[in-house]
């Protein structure tokens, strides 16, 4: 069972009584056929639920009102099978607070050249019914998605499925609770921000709990639970000699297991699905949570270090969006560069906390090594390299008057040399279009040093995320040129200033 099983998307057909009972009967019949086929064959993440025809203002408004108050409804897919005068939709759309997609399709794929008549034309009017619906959306300044294509087309299926992921993610975000264990890293700017504005814009709440509250739960964990979790470590990872039974760091592994169990219990009891820690606020914990955080991220929790609640929330959101897709999603940080003409590289990592969902297939190494930052006992961590291939890194920043999402398309590459003295998980990539352009654009746009790294999602997913939340997006990819990028930032400043 996944998070998508908790939601459904309503399929709404727009028409009108002008065409008579027989036409409306055929519209209903077609709608039932399409919905059944999509649910059976399209591999959509959510179930489509067909609602009664929308043929009058009252019917349409009732559907929109019901959608708002049904917690299982993640959004609406609207098909204008016939012409549906858009003034009928104004009241409903004005109150609708769920994501909306127009599926611009028709029942038949090919025109029946020899038999087409006006009855056929009146029944199959998506071509201009969809335009009428589009006008009222533009007139009302209502953000909605449009997918054009025949309902049997696999590309249309893929695009609807991707939108469904966004719709479910938005509903989950409205319920998301982010727990900050301690505060932000002292004097750091980008990890701070307006938590009230974030809740107004996205819906997630951010609050702080004292590390002592967590420590109390951690200390309540019994040896039996710890032993069971250690057995799981033994079967899932390759343990270094120091971390095995009778190894000199075995107790550190047990303490890491205690912290993991305590953190998970605390998060479950509080209904949290994202959290932060900071190495400056660990009072009562024997080690910086490394292994615990890595494993919790792999289970779907959002996380970021140094109190960075925006990145923690974004990671959770992107974890939900990518549920069931191939490839992983992780907290990440641009750490250091390899400058080589024509082969500039970025080595990404963090002190400990990189999610194993992005790891290569072989078992990660479980090790305990010294960590100078934090002043605690040596922490346990998983060490691995990352899968290769196309990926993205994304950052959500608070500009005071608005939020900006930055996305850099990257190409993850194999590490050309072993890293015997680097005791942390890492990813190596080439930034698009090149490191100088990507880094300068990122810096000029104010992108954070913390990011969410994903093999599972792509630029189109993040564009949809920005659209569905009505926030600015700045894209850095192979098409980026710095003069045009700077111009876009200036234009956005004017646009969002006027929009306020």
Curated annotation (Swiss-Prot):
Principal EC category: isomerase
UniProt xrefs under InterPro entries: Ara_Isoase_C, AraA_central, AraA_N, AraA_N_sf, Fuc/Ara_isomerase_C, Fucose_isomerase_N/cen_sf, Lara_isomerase
Record's keyword terms, sorted: Arabinose catabolism, Carbohydrate metabolism, Isomerase, Manganese, Metal-binding
Catalytic activity: beta-L-arabinopyranose = L-ribulose
Cofactor: Mn(2+)
Amino-acid positions noted as binding Mn(2+) in the UniProt annotation, renumbered to this chain: 306, 333, 350, 450
Superkingdom to which the source organism belongs: Bacteria
Entry annotated with the keyword Manganese: yes
One of the GO biological process terms: L-arabinose catabolic process to xylulose 5-phosphate
Pathway(s): Carbohydrate degradation; L-arabinose degradation via L-ribulose; D-xylulose 5-phosphate from L-arabinose (bacterial route): step 1/3
Listed GO MF terms: L-arabinose isomerase activity; manganese ion binding
Alphabetical list of CDD domains matching this protein: L-arabinose_isomerase (cd03557)
Cofactor remark: Binds 1 Mn(2+) ion per subunit.
EC number: 5.3.1.4
Main function: Catalyzes the conversion of L-arabinose to L-ribulose.
Subunit description: Homohexamer.
Protein family per UniProt: Belongs to the arabinose isomerase family.
Record-given protein name: L-arabinose isomerase
